[in-house]
Amino acid sequence: MARFIFITGGVVSSLGKGLASAALGALLQARGFSVRLRKLDPYLNVDPGTMSPFEHGEVFVTDDGAETDLDLGHYERFTGVAARKTDSVSSGRIYSNVLEKERRGDYLGKTIQVIPHVTNEIKDFISIGEDEVDFMLCEIGGTVGDIEGLPFFEAIRQFSQDKPRGQCIFMHLTLLPYIKASGELKTKPTQHSVKELRSIGLAPDILVCRSEGPIPQKEREKLALFCNVRPDSVIAAQDLSTIYDAPLAYHREGLDQAVLDAFQISPAPKPDLTKWEDVSDRVHNPEGEVKIAIVGKYVQLEDAYKSIAEALTHGGMANRVKVRIEWVDAEIFEKEDPAPHLEGFHAILVPGGFGERGTEGKIKAAQYAREHQVPYLGICLGMQMAVIEAARNVAGIAGAGSEEFDHEAGKKRFEPVVYHLKEWVQGNYKVSRKVDDDKGGTMRLGAYDAVLKEGSRVAEVYGGTAIEERHRHRYEVDIKYREQLEKAGLCFSGMSPDGRLPEIVEWTDHPWFIGVQYHPELKSKPFDPHPLFADFVRAAKESSRLV
């Protein structure tokens, strides 16, 4: 039976609850315990799949096809435990489930209310798989005091009462602002946040306090006194130069020991932090630097490409180099020559996206990389734009483009080298889609197999010809153009097992030019870098010696 750790936040959002949860999960693993992490989001969207990247940041996709919060990416990267659909839920999903049950008559004519029906649905979600692990860490999105979060806070209060004493603890993450004028850390916002938490029936066992620097002992004792926690359960979460120092930093602060003490687990197994010490060493002691341009549509919010940035960092670790990322707005290249902007970069990455805006700029970035022999990695839309560039400028397919852009414009303008994917095989089933289907949850989502061409670069990179990668797309390169494109030198080096869907393309006469329809960044980890990113950074390292 799992022990439950509920992580809440106060004062302000974006303090790092997800990272704190992931780091704690990693520390518990280092002591030999099994963990699973969950995210409960109070927003009313059913999932983040239809939310703007500017609004929400990256959508993290699981193997089983769930579109989830980017925090699940942190959970996977730090613990290596693959997230599932049952590890992410929103108010929208909870209310949808309750209303579906009401329509079916599951409640036998009762008046449906937040308490007990909504809270029971939340508790049922939290309980899924509780017999599988030693610790279940559940992060509640938002901050204490948000009206949207009240059903979740009430649900975890009830949940802790339903369980035997000592099976649930609460960890509260707050901000200790530093006032330069007085030279002081202020504890009052944290005190008020805990007061708000206690007013709804929740008392924190552990306080994690985000601050710019160390927390003096006097402030720790003050927080312990007024927030009713043990002094050694007041944990400093100082600003760090890299998120990969978080497990070691939290261990030095005693977070994992405070959790074990709260559960009265004694004697506690000693942690083995060897792999995190190695990760930290690789981050802080690089033997060189490479510059990589990410040419994207949502570069104003870097969280929109969170997993890509982290995967590049992992690739840097594998090659003992620091990866310096520079964000380039693809729209700039629709009006300007890309050469002055891209000269000096050791590699170019074009990530995914939706809609026509910025795509001509991405096509120009792919053209620049091809013509100037710069290592190029195109992901999802980045692969599609590389294929369109090849079709237009090498294969002689005039007017090559994507059906996505025609659908957006409401008229046919392009030769559809990229088309709307209407059916595909998922396991033993055929999935069908129409252009006018709902947007939510209708893409080709989750893990799919691919078969690589023997002797291709990607087969060499992966060390084999059978792979499984995660997807999130509704448009696909049309295989009917394959022969014409391959005659021009663009190799279709990865296909779906039935041979109908192109998964990978590469230029055979280029030092390193690969486009993939899937999202390899979603499976990369600091202690297990994805082979594509590791080899891409290796190619950038080679390129840096030539520039």
From Swiss-Prot:
HAMAP family with a match to the protein in the record: PyrG
Family to which this protein belongs: Belongs to the CTP synthase family.
GO biological process, alphabetically ordered: 'de novo' CTP biosynthetic process; pyrimidine nucleobase biosynthetic process
Sites where the protein binds L-glutamine: G353, L381, G382, M383, Q384, E404, R474
Functional description taken from the UniProt entry: Catalyzes the ATP-dependent amination of UTP to CTP with either L-glutamine or ammonia as the source of nitrogen. Regulates intracellular CTP levels through interactions with the four ribonucleotide triphosphates.
NCBIfam families listed in its UniProt record: PRK05380.1 (NF003792), PyrG (TIGR00337)
EC number: 6.3.4.2
Control of this protein's activity: Allosterically activated by GTP, when glutamine is the substrate; GTP has no effect on the reaction when ammonia is the substrate. The allosteric effector GTP functions by stabilizing the protein conformation that binds the tetrahedral intermediate(s) formed during glutamine hydrolysis. Inhibited by the product CTP, via allosteric rather than competitive inhibition.
Note: CTPSs have evolved a hybrid strategy for distinguishing between UTP and CTP. The overlapping regions of the product feedback inhibitory and substrate sites recognize a common feature in both compounds, the triphosphate moiety. To differentiate isosteric substrate and product pyrimidine rings, an additional pocket far from the expected kinase/ligase catalytic site, specifically recognizes the cytosine and ribose portions of the product inhibitor.
InterPro entries: Class_I_gatase-like, CTP_synthase, CTP_synthase_N, GATASE, GATase1_CTP_Synthase, P-loop_NTPase
Binding site for Mg(2+): D71, E139
Domain Glutamine amidotransferase type-1 residues, every copy: 291-546
Protein name, UniProt field: CTP synthase
Any GO CC annotation of this UniProt entry: cytosol
Protein's UniProt keywords contain ATP-binding: yes
Enzymatic reactions: UTP + L-glutamine + ATP + H2O = CTP + L-glutamate + ADP + phosphate + 2 H(+); L-glutamine + H2O = L-glutamate + NH4(+); UTP + NH4(+) + ATP = CTP + ADP + phosphate + 2 H(+)
PROSITE patterns assigned: GATASE_TYPE_1
Assigned keywords, A-Z: ATP-binding, Glutamine amidotransferase, Ligase, Magnesium, Metal-binding, Nucleotide-binding, Pyrimidine biosynthesis
Binding site for ATP: S14, L15, G16, K17, G18, L19, D71
Organism: Ruegeria pomeroyi (strain ATCC 700808 / DSM 15171 / DSS-3) (Silicibacter pomeroyi)
GO molecular function, one term: glutaminase activity
Superkingdom of the organism of origin: Bacteria
Enzyme class at the top of the EC tree: ligase
Active site: C380, H519, E521
PANTHER family (alphabetical): CTP SYNTHASE, CTP SYNTHASE-RELATED
Region ranges (Amidoligase domain): 1-265
